[in-house]
A protein has these predicted regions:
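Short, hinge-like loop/turn segments at secondary-structure boundaries
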Residues: 16-20, 63-66
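Short acidic/histidine-rich active-site segments
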Residues: 43-59, 149
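Acceptor-substrate binding/catalytic loop of class I
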Residues: 22-26
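A conserved beta-strand->alpha-helix junction
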Residues: 1-19, 98-114
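ATP-dependent adenylation/nucleotidyltransferase module used to activate substrates
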Residues: 1-14, 27-49, 136, 189
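Short catalytic/ligand-binding loop motif for oxyanion handling, primarily in non-cytosolic enzymes
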Residues: 8-12, 54-58, 63, 206
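A mobile, often basic/glycine-rich helix-loop segment
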Residues: 55-82
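Adenosyl-5′-phosphate
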Residues: 28, 45-47, 79-257
Length: 257
């Protein structure tokens, strides 16, 4: 079992951002970079389970009605809060939401749907394709960049297009049998894995909720906002400073922004 301390995760944030080369996922990136470097000390190749949740229906938005039917990217929670942190001359929340809404409408219009599909099946197909084309692609890109930065090759067998094409056309009842997420994959692994692993509840990628990590990030943000940097030129200094000084910045730790 590998563990990463608050200081390790915070210290690697700049490196993770550099290797990601685009807006990323903070501690979700830096902790993965840390873990990949630890694995690389003993191994050059690893196998990862990325893509199984998107294909076999492991995320809550595949079975929670309020998420699967919300009419937007189901993993996004109030993006206007994040958009409001930009300076008005750089990006306005209204423009950002219009862009996201247009992207969502285009994404769902591209989902392959059969004439015989009922509303539940259509919603499930949309959740699958949104997850594969957006959520999964983001996680694969993150995995590639963090692992390669550690000189570790990570293979993703579930990303085989033949698996996606086959499972996509299976009914939801097969993939979500008896209300159990990824039930098809669990059944396929019977006899190959111990029962306590085979039937355990999904455990998401570990992200920190530590107050120590939060304190370190507050200090880093505070320092950056007081510099004459590009970061300070696109982010509203007053709003971010107010957030830093506030009691609740829990959304900084959310897996997907």
């Amino acid at each position: 079992i590998l563990t990463a301390g608050d200081r390790d995760v915070a210290k690697l944030l700049p490196e993770a951002a550099y290797f990601r080369d685009m807006p990323g996922q903070a501690d979700i990136d830096s902790s993965l970079l840390y873990f990949c470097r630890q694995v690389r000390k003993s191994h050059t190749v690893a196998i990862s389970g990325e893509c199984s949740d998107e294909i076999f229906g492991g995320y809550p938005w595949f079975y929670r009605p309020e998420m699967i039917n919300r009419g937007f990217f189901p993993w996004m929670h109030d993006p206007t809060v994040r958009l409001s942190l930009f300076r008005d001359e750089f990006a306005r929340p209204k423009d950002g939401m219009e862009f996201l809404s247009a992207a969502y409408k285009k994404a769902v219009s591209d989902v392959p749907i059969a004439d015989s599909d009922d509303d539940e099946t259509i919603a499930y197909r949309r959740a699958t394709m949104l997850s594969v084309n957006y959520f999964m692609s983001n996680l694969l890109e993150r995995k590639d960049r963090m692992s390669m930065a550690a000189s570790l090759e990570v293979r993703v067998p579930f990303a085989d297009h033949r698996i996606i094409e086959f499972v996509y056309d299976l009914p939801k009842s097969v993939k979500f049998e008896n209300g159990v997420e990824k039930s098809l994959l669990r059944r396929a692994a019977e006899g190959l894995l111990p029962d306590n692993i085979l039937h355990r509840k999904k455990s998401p990628y570990p992200k920190t909720h530590s107050k120590g990590y939060e304190r370190l990030v507050r200090e880093m943000l505070d320092s950056k906002m007081r510099e004459d940097s590009f970061f300070a030129s696109v982010i509203d200094r007053k709003k971010v400073c107010a957030m830093i000084d506030g009691d609740d910045i829990t959304w900084l730790g959310q897996l997907m922004s």
